[in-house]
Amino acid sequence: MRFLFYSHDGFGLGHTCRNLAIARALVAASPKATVLLATGSDDCARLDIPERVEILKLPSLRKLANERYGSRNLVVSESEIRALRSRLLSSAIETFWPDVLLVDKHPFGANGELRDGLERLRDHGGRSVLGLRDILDAPETVAAEWRPHGLPDRIHDFYDRVLVYGQREIFDSVAAYGFSPALAARTAYCGYVAAPEETPDDRPSASTAHSHAVPRPGAGRPVVLATVGGGEDGFELLRTFLETAGDAPWRSIAVTGPLVRNGEGQRLAELAGRSGAELHRFVPRLGDWFSSVAAVVCMGGYNTVTQGLQRGTPLVCVPRTHPRREQVLRAEALGRLGLLRHLDPARLDASSLKAAVTEALGLSRPNLARQIRSHLRFDGAEVAAQHLLAQARARRGMRRPGLRISVPTPMLALA
C-alpha cells in the first residue's frame, strides 16, 4: 500500500513532524505500507526517518502572509516557485500513484500547488485525506479565508476523509469552522498526535549522541528548557528567558531552532555566554528531553505542547499571536483545564517569566500527569494510521495507471 504525505512547511517544522509521526505509526501498523513524504523543510534530513518512509524534498517556502508563500532560497517569483513545486508534486503522484494522499492543513496546498495532482489522483480512483491540527485559527479568520473560495464544499468534493488531530471536547473544529453536515459526517477526531519517546534500541551511540545528551539536574538545581520550534519568531521569548538565567535557581537550556536568523542567533549566543546558560541550535528528538527536565518554556505550537503534555511536563507558554491566533486559543483552552500556564506575550518580561517558571516548578508532577491523562488522548498518530489503512483497503482493486517512461539513448563517452 502506497501513501503520499504532503506538508508545505512555510513556517516552522510542525507540519512535517506531525506527518512523520503518523508515517511512523502507519508503517508500524502494516508491513505492506510505504510512505513518500513530500516537504519543503530544509532540516528534514536531520529528522528520524523510519524504514519504508522516504523524503521527497521540495524547494523551500517562506511565509509572506496568511495564504501567501514565496521561495525561501531560490531567487524566483511567487508564481515560479508555485509552478515548480506543483509540477514536482504532480510528477510524484503520477509516478508513485499512491493509494492514499494525506494533506496537512492546506486542502489544495500552499498557493494552490497541489490542485492539479489532487485532480489527477481523484480521476484515477485514489483516495485523499485532509489532516487538520486541533486549532487552525480564530473561527472568524478561517471563515474569511474559506468562504470566498467555497472551501468547505470543495473539501467535500475532493476529500474522502477529514482527520482532526485533537479532541472535540477541547476545541470543536466542526462547529467553529462551519462544516456542512455532509463534511462533518466525513470528519473524525483522532486525539493528539505526539511522537513516541525513543526506546533503548532507538538511542544513538555515545559517539553520535555526545553533543545532545539528555540533560540531568546537578547540584540540586532543576533543569528548565526553553524551545521555540523552528525558531523564526522566537527571539523575544528566548532573549527574556536568557535574561532570567543569570540569577535563576535553575539550570537554563535554550534551543533556538534551525530557522533562527543569523543576527538573532548571535545575540542569543552572547546572552547565553554572559548568563551561563546552555544554548543549542537544533536537537534531534527534542521531545525526548521533556521527561528529564523540570519545566519547559515554549510558545505554544502544536508539537511542543502535545509532547510536553504527553510526558507530564510542566509547561509555561508564551503563545504567538500573529499571523495566526491558534497558539493563543490552544493555550487558553488547555489553561482553563489547569494543564499549563500561559503568559500574554505583550506583557512578557523577565519578572513575569521567572514567576511563571517558579510556579510551574512547584507543581506535583504525578498529580499533573494524572490531570492531563484525565482530559487528553495522545494516540492520534495510531488512530490516524488506522483511518489511512481503511482508505487504502477501500481503494484496493482499482487499477493503478500504467507508467510509460521514455529513456533517452545514452551518449557514448569520449575517450
Please name every model-derived segment.
Residues 285-329:
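A donor-sugar binding/catalytic signature common to diverse glycosyltransferases
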Residues 7-20, 43-44, 234-235:
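A short, glycine/small-residue-rich beta-strand->loop->alpha-helix junction that serves as a flexible
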Residues 355, 359-415:
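C-terminal amphipathic helix plus adjacent low-complexity
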Residues 5-7, 25-80, 84-86:
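Conserved nucleotide-sugar phosphate-binding/catalytic loop shared by glycosyltransferases and other
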Residues 89-111:
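Short N-terminal targeting/anchoring amphipathic segment
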Residues 23-25, 177, 192-295:
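Donor-nucleotide binding loops and adjacent catalytic segments primarily
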Residues 118-189:
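Active-site-proximal region of nucleotide-activated glycan assembly enzymes
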